[in-house]
């Protein structure tokens, strides 16, 4: 199991500068959560215990403001900024949380690990894992792409990906409550890179590949499966949407940035002893990744 080194301080400064001035958004905030409320949530996040959160009545802009305040603090605990994640990609997910469109959050690199991992089952207050896909940015031109084939020109690689999220909040949550928590991001596991080929064949493979989630302790029981086109009709449509949203927010993508494109399979709750395998059939070399969830550890609560 490998843990990546920190990214440059320059990238961390880019995030901090954006947040300090709230320069990433031009909209005025009506009731941005107080710093003390954000600090209270962060203290619970670090301990891995449930939090009160920011309340169900947050407006879209107030939720974004809370997200940026929280993101300013998260590098102390999760390492440097590694990229951005997309959530509420499917219509079902948006209906569940009352979201009108996809939403995005920040990702950090300290808990970004490779291929095979052993993770404590209680890695968060309300831990979940899901099958996902990420792309690695080649240049900022992705925001100008209009088709999957055009998008490939601005990407270096794609990678199967398992996100480790932590809802932190008990009970049903609104879309804005989740946005304020940086969309529950806590960590992730990725497979080796699949180099991008700027061809229609490669673009088609990204749309038609099938991901299967298997439980190795249950004789390979299938926990879920999906095609790539569950992500906004094509995963690269999701990538383009996210790049445009980031540009609108004043964020310029850099080479090496990672974009998480949303859940392919409904998130699952980990249990101690689970051995999960994700198979991505139809992608070049049909990559896989594995994770074992170990016994819970004592957080000293």
PLM features per residue range, with description:
Residues 249-251, 260:
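C-terminal soluble interaction/assembly domains
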Residues 26-30:
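Sec/Tat signal peptide C-region and signal peptidase I cleavage site
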Residues 2-16:
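Bacterial N-terminal signal peptides that target proteins for export
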Residues 16-24:
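Bacterial N-terminal signal peptides
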Residues 265-268, 282-286:
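Short, charged beta-turn/beta-strand-edge "cap" motif at the junction between a beta-strand
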Residues 31-234, 287-292:
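Catalytic-core "active-site belt" of small-molecule-metabolizing enzymes
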């Amino acid at each position: 199991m490998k843990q990546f080194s920190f990214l440059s301080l320059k990238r961390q400064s880019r995030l901090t500068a954006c947040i300090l001035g709230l320069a990433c958004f031009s909209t005025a905030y009506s009731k941005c959560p107080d710093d003390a409320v954000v600090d209270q949530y962060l203290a619970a996040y670090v301990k891995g215990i449930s939090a009160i959160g920011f309340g169900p009545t947050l407006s879209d802009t107030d939720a974004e403001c809370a997200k940026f305040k929280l993101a300013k603090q998260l590098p102390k605990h999760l390492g440097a900024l590694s990229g951005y994640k997309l959530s509420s990609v499917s219509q079902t997910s948006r209906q569940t949380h009352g979201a009108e469109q996809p939403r995005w959050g920040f990702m950090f690199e300290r808990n970004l690990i490779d291929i095979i991992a052993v993770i404590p089952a209680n890695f968060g207050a309300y831990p979940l894992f899901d099958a996902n896909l990420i792309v690695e940015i080649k240049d900022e031109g992705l925001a100008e792409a209009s088709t999957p084939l055009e998008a490939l020109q601005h990407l270096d690689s794609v990678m199967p990906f398992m996100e480790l999220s932590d809802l932190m909040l008990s009970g049903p949550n609104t879309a804005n409550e989740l946005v304020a928590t940086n969309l529950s991001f806590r960590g992730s596991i990725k497979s080796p890179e699949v180099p991008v080929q700027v061809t229609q064949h490669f673009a088609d493979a990204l749309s038609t590949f099938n991901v299967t989630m298997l439980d190795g302790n249950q004789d390979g029981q299938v926990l879920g499966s999906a095609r790539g086109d569950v992500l906004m009709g094509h995963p690269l449509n999701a990538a383009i949407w996210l790049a445009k949203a980031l540009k609108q927010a004043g964020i310029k993508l850099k080479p090496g940035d990672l974009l998480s494109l949303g859940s392919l399979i409904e998130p699952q709750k980990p249990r101690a002893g689970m051995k999960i395998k994700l198979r991505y059939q139809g992608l070049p070399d049909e990559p896989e990744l594995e994770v074992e969830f170990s016994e819970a550890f004592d957080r000293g609560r």
